[in-house]
Curated annotation (Swiss-Prot):
Domain free text: The N-terminal nucleotide binding domain (NBD) (also known as the ATPase domain) is responsible for binding and hydrolyzing ATP. The C-terminal substrate-binding domain (SBD) (also known as peptide-binding domain) binds to the client/substrate proteins. The two domains are allosterically coupled so that, when ATP is bound to the NBD, the SBD binds relatively weakly to clients. When ADP is bound in the NBD, a conformational change enhances the affinity of the SBD for client proteins.
Protein name: Heat shock cognate 71 kDa protein
Main function: Molecular chaperone implicated in a wide variety of cellular processes, including protection of the proteome from stress, folding and transport of newly synthesized polypeptides, activation of proteolysis of misfolded proteins and the formation and dissociation of protein complexes. Plays a pivotal role in the protein quality control system, ensuring the correct folding of proteins, the re-folding of misfolded proteins and controlling the targeting of proteins for subsequent degradation. This is achieved through cycles of ATP binding, ATP hydrolysis and ADP release, mediated by co-chaperones.
Cited SUPFAM superfamilies: Actin-like ATPase domain (SSF53067), Heat shock protein 70kD (HSP70), C-terminal subdomain (SSF100934), Heat shock protein 70kD (HSP70), peptide-binding domain (SSF100920)
Keyword line: ATP-binding, Nucleotide-binding, Stress response
UniProt GO cellular component terms: cytoplasm; cytosol; nucleus; plasma membrane
Gene: hsc70
GO molecular-function terms, A-Z: ATP binding; ATP hydrolysis activity; ATP-dependent protein folding chaperone; heat shock protein binding; protein folding chaperone
Region (Nucleotide-binding domain (NBD)): 2-386
Family: Belongs to the heat shock protein 70 family.
Single Gene Ontology BP annotation: chaperone cofactor-dependent protein refolding
Species assigned in the record: Oryzias latipes
Family annotation (PROSITE patterns): HSP70_1, HSP70_2, HSP70_3
Region feature (Substrate-binding domain (SBD)): 394-507
Length: 686
């Protein structure tokens, strides 16, 4: 395949979305199920790996080996209280690998474990494939979005996931900023406007305030919670119904992973219903120990269950206003992004906070982030379209960055909401004469000291002994991805010294990433083999059943000899019986069986075509009439199942009689490329 354009990927906690900017506009790309968002789920079975819709659709049957919420694990330590809390809600197993969390699953009869970066890379690979299928070209470059409040470790881990999936990550950008691009381009904002992006998704929450003017998007402040979203609202409802089930039936389902998963899926559906109705029903047959669980929940009860979480969404709004030094009256537009902003109570709380100001719902909350990422991808890959050529994005770092030096003193070098990329230099010194080295600890500074996040330590060694304290110039450089790099120069020698960073967050090493890239390619190759096998099996099954039903159709009575009919039926039954006994055969075996079946069927079908319409070269072949219903029957027998519909749509009433010329020109010609009829030499398009 030729090289395709760069894409924008919204890698979400629960759903992901991919878009591309081409021909002067953004196109959000639908997956093979026709959905414009794809579940961020990966499932492992005895025979294959499933990603996206296929994975989510089987989760109730295979809860312990279906992984989701990788975004809530990525860039975190195993002992992080957030990870420990989430583990109570996850049906899959999370293990401790030298302070780094890994998910453990059974795959093809073996126990396998994966880092969150690997799971996320599988979802990214799926999004890459969705784009490639649509574009017909190889996709190598992408912009990937992250919550604005993601820290350095989470950003780096997301970038690593992109690398493992085979993508060159052009940029990591903040989700609300990407949504603002979508809004700004959609509204064609000219004069200066202050826009507040309220982004509440499946697992994360961000608030950003931007000033948009003539294509310049300047982020003024950002705030949020990397662990708040629709899944937390689902959890409250699940716990409510577990308690109700226990109260009604004196049975505790909380330890039954399959039952809890079925309940969770029902709660997610109910939550969506409550955005447009005041009541939703839950109906689950044989939920636990044969008990059918039929109940309902009102919107008021749902709001009461989540009252503290809903109210808590206003805290980051207030914080971002303070940081931007703005009054709520100075905000021109409040833009809703993320599926959870459809919840009426959240909309009401936000509207009341802004004194009844109308909320802007003009952009698709599920697609806006991918839309903005696609625009940024186009800009970074040199697109010169009029719509985007003058667009400038000025983003900020969400957290202050500081160093803890001798005596536990915290020195902030880069303040939060500083425009990135940025570089700050500070001169440090040793605290005693003849000190051979300096150890400094680098922190992301939270609101409270206890929230300070240790990014790592750097040690400057090899300082020549001196009676006067040498001057060490340390430079902190935050790039456009929001990822930090550190360098240092010993001013006494004028020479740059190498800094060794030991990262307590346990980032992947270069060797780890290279190994994971190779493993990802191996898993993809296995997936391709499995896909080919399933395709060959389905093709054989479809062919055998279609052929069988065709010759048994009463419309063929008198047109096919009993001997020929029996030949086809016997061979079809033989193949169907073989299929029943060989569900896990290899692709070549299915292909061989199909060839054997075609050897029996094709000559008989050829004979039927000849008797129905005459072969080319026969007298007055252009004028011979042929029964359309017979041609449809025969065509269907020779085609894959999905093409049945295509023929039915392209044909008119079966009772009509067409000349062969009309039939083939008007109908067969239009679908020839799809049906590949030229593989059957007895069908000629005149």
């Amino acid at each position: 395949m030729s090289k395709g354009p760069a894409v924008g990927i919204d890698l979400g906690t629960t759903y992901s979305c991919v878009g591309v900017f081409q021909h002067g506009k953004v196109e959000i790309i639908a997956n093979d199920q026709g959905n414009r968002t794809t579940p961020s789920y990966v499932a492992f079975t005895d025979t294959e790996r499933l990603i996206g819709d296929a994975a989510k659709n089987q989760v109730a049957m295979n809860p312990t080996n279906t992984v989701f919420d990788a975004k809530r694990l990525i860039g975190r330590r195993f002992d992080d209280h957030v990870v420990q809390s989430d583990m109570n809600d996850w049906p899959f197993n999370v293990i401790n690998d030298n302070t780094r969390p890994k998910v453990q699953v059974e795959y093809k009869g073996e126990t396998k474990s994966f880092y969150p970066e690997e799971v996320s890379s599988m979802v990214l690979t799926k999004m890459k494939e969705i784009a490639e299928a649509y574009l017909g070209k190889t996709v190598n470059n992408a912009v990937i979005t992250v919550p604005a409040y993601f820290n350095d470790s989470q950003r780096q881990a997301t970038k690593d996931a992109g690398t493992i999936s085979g993508l060159n990550v052009l940029r990591i950008i903040n989700e609300p900023t990407a949504a603002a691009i979508a809004y700004g381009l959609d509204k064609k904002v000219g004069s200066e406007r202050n826009v507040l992006i309220f982004d509440l998704g499946g697992g994360t929450f961000d608030v950003s305030i931007l000033t948009i003017e003539d294509g310049i998007f300047e982020v003024k402040s950002t705030a949020g919670d990397t662990h708040l979203g629709g899944e937390d609202f689902d959890n409250r409802m699940v716990n409510h119904f577990i308690a109700e089930f226990k109260r009604k039936y004196k049975k505790d389902i909380s330890d039954n992973k399959r039952a809890v998963r079925r309940l969770r899926s029902a709660c997610e559906r109910a939550k969506r219903t409550l955005s447009s109705s005041t009541q939703a029903s839950i109906e689950i047959d044989s939920l636990y120990e044969g008990v059918d669980f039929y109940t309902s929940i009102t919107r008021a009860r749902f709001e009461e269950l989540n009252a503290d979480l809903f109210r808590g969404t206003l805290d980051p709004v207030e914080k971002s206003l303070r940081d931007a030094k703005m009054d709520k009256g100075q905000i021109h537009d409040i833009v809703l992004v993320g599926g959870s902003t459809r919840i009426p109570k959240i909309q009401k709380l936000l509207q009341d906070f802004f004194n009844g100001k109308e909320l802007n719902k003009s952009i698709n909350p599920d697609e806006a982030v991918a839309y903005g990422a696609a625009v940024q991808a186009a800009i970074l890959s040199g697109d010169k379209s009029e719509n985007v050529q003058d667009l400038l994005l000025l983003d900020v770092t969400p957290l202050s960055l500081g160093i803890e030096t001798a005596g536990g003193v915290m020195t902030v070098l880069i303040k939060r909401n500083t425009t990135i990329p940025t570089k700050q230099t500070q001169t440090f010194t040793t605290y005693s004469d003849n000190q051979p080295g300096v150890l400094n600890q680098v922190y992301e500074v939270g609101a409270m000291t206890k929230d300070n996040n240790l990014l790592g330590k750097f040690e400057l060694t090899g300082i020549p002994p001196a009676l006067w304290c040498p001057q060490i110039e340390v430079t902190f450089d935050i790039d456009a991805n929001g990822i930090m790099n550190v360098s240092a120069v010993d001013k006494s020698t004028g020479k740059e010294n190498k800094i060794t960073i030991t990262n307590d967050k346990g980032r992947l090493s270069k060797e780890d990433i290279e190994r994971m890239v190779q493993e990802a390619e191996k898993y993809k190759a296995e997936d391709d083999v499995q896909r080919d096998k399933v395709s060959a099996k389905n093709g054989l099954e479809s062919y055998a059943f279609n052929m069988k039903s065709t010759v048994e159709d009463e419309k063929l009575a008198g047109k096919i000899s009993d001997e020929d009919k029996q030949k086809i039926l016997d061979k079809c039954n033989e193949v169907i019986s073989w299929l029943d006994k060989n569900q896990t055969a290899e692709r070549d075996e299915y292909v061989h069986q199909q060839k054997e079946l075609e050897k029996v069927c094709n000559p008989i079908i050829t004979k039927l075509y000849q008797s129905a319409g005459g072969m080319p070269g026969g007298c007055q072949r252009e004028c011979q009439e042929v029964s359309l219903e017979l041609v449809v029957l025969l065509a269907v027998a020779l085609l894959d199942q999905p093409l049945k519909k295509l023929i039915k749509h392209s044909m008119t009433s079966p009772s009509k009689i067409f000349t062969k010329k009309t039939l083939f020109k008007c109908n067969m010609q239009s679908i020839k490329s799809v049906m590949r009829l030229n593989q059957f030499p007895f069908i000629t398009i005149t």
